[in-house]
Amino acid sequence: MRGDLEWGTIPGLVRSAARRYGEVEAVVDGRTRVSYAELGARVERAAAACVANGVRVGDRVAIWAPNSLDWIGAALGAVSAGAVLVPLNTRFKGGEAADVLARSRAKLLFITGTFLGTSYVASLRRAAGRAAAGGTVAGGAV
């Protein structure tokens, strides 16, 4: 059977896989292993977080994180909430990320703490501080 007819949507595929494959291993991220059922629950929590933060169908939700279990859950959760996904390159500096966030009008950002020795949160705060002081970030003012 064609997947698009069976599941209809990506969220439908996630729910179907959680039901169909349950405790079968779905994702391995370092030492962390999760089943399809666990992945489905993570996706539902991320979707609920989007909705609780005011995300509506068609809103943009950004993710600034490396490929990981958390990225998968956040991305599928955002899509499940009806959002348009805005993935940010992990090599971006704070100003570049701030520029993409502003241009995309992202309503919500899923962000990792630190990756490759860089604190993404601190990087964004520095960019916001420069913009508040009248400076610019890559691509223009924020």
Task: Please identify what each model-predicted range represents.
Residues 7-10, 16, 44-45, 120-133:
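Short amphipathic alpha-helical surface micro-motifs
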